[in-house]
């Protein structure tokens, strides 16, 4: 469930369903140069501080250079847990809160920064509020725990031109590779997208600790075609990513974390993509099929 627009602050929202373990709340926005602090709260029963419990309170503080984590229960604030604030004034940010059975896992700008143990049962969360010195432009929650390897059909007409596959995930600590396959009904692979961490990209001497290449290919009538490997590997171990594969009439347009990565000309009929496979050293947090959005310059 996504709301891709700007929001008034303070922001208040009632969740249409209770948060389940494995789901992720994604919040994107921008701080202002005069920011002192802003807050993200997960509430029980009402999106305010009228006395009901607050299972999670995040206070991003620029005046202290800290992020404060806490919970409010039975009319009392608990003990604060403090950590360094990695967000700078005036910067864009991406904050993710993933729910687990025993904790909230918090990531900022795709890096995990905190595990906050539940003090109030997860199933009590019903509302979200955001307030303070912040510009808010994206709120989304969803996902689940996915098995890997993962295989599924694509609903309705499949991934036809005009549709985008969005994959949210994190390469494992010792990841060597993972792959995403878009399948035709006959089992051919329209697109094999294969980030590899144990190879060097063509034309690049990689100094990062996780160098690699990203192989693109197709399997047609049981035979692999010519590999395409241009470009650095934009994926890093233990760093979350958003991968968009947009199906257009003549090619797949591939974006990683909102940045254009590659274009892959169709080698098979782009109207006949009916299945998805994901394999390898990856933790999946979300999969969506949405309508294509205009490319960002």
From Swiss-Prot:
Taxonomic superkingdom: Eukaryota
Binding residues for a beta-D-galactoside: 224-230
GO molecular function: carbohydrate binding; galactoside binding
GO cellular component: plasma membrane
Alphabetical keyword list: Lectin, Repeat
Domain Galectin: 11-142, 151-290
InterPro entries: ConA-like_dom_sf, Galectin-like, Galectin_CRD
Gene3D superfamilies: 2.60.120.200
Function: Binds galactose.
Name of the protein in its database record: 32 kDa beta-galactoside-binding lectin lec-3
Organism for this UniProt entry: Caenorhabditis elegans
Recorded name of the encoding gene: lec-3
């Amino acid at each position: 469930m996504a709301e891709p627009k700007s929001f008034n602050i303070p922001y208040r929202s009632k969740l249409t369903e209770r948060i389940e373990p494995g789901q992720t709340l994604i919040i994107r926005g921008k701080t202002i140069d005069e920011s002192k602090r802003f807050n993200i709260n997960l509430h029980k029963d009402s999106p305010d501080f009228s006395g009901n419990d607050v299972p999670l309170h995040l206070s991003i503080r620029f005046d202290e250079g800290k992020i404060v984590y806490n919970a409010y229960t039975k009319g009392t604030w608990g003990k604060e847990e403090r950590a360094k604030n990695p967000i700078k004034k005036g910067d864009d940010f991406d904050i993710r809160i993933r729910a687990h059975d025993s904790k909230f896992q918090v990531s900022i700008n795709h890096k995990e920064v905190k595990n906050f143990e539940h003090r109030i049962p997860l199933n009590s969360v019903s509302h979200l509020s955001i307030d303070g010195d912040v510009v808010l432009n994206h709120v989304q929650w969803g996902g689940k725990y996915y098995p890997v390897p993962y295989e599924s059909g694509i609903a309705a007409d499949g991934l036809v031109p005009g549709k985008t596959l969005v994959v949210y995930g994190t390469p494992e600590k010792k990841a060597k590779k993972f792959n995403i396959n878009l399948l035709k009904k006959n089992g051919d692979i329209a697109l094999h997208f294969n980030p590899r961490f144990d190879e060097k990209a063509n034309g690049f001497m990689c100094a990062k600790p996780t160098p690699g290449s990203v192989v693109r290919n197709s399997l047609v009538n049981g035979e692999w075609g010519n590999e395409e490997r241009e470009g650095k590997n934009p994926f890093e171990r233990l760093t979350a990513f958003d991968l968009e594969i947009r199906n257009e009439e003549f090619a797949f347009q591939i974006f990683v974390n909102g940045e254009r990565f590659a274009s892959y000309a169709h080698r098979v009929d782009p109207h006949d993509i009916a299945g998805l496979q994901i394999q390898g050293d990856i933790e999946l947090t979300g999969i969506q099929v949405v309508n294509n959005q205009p490319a960002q310059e």
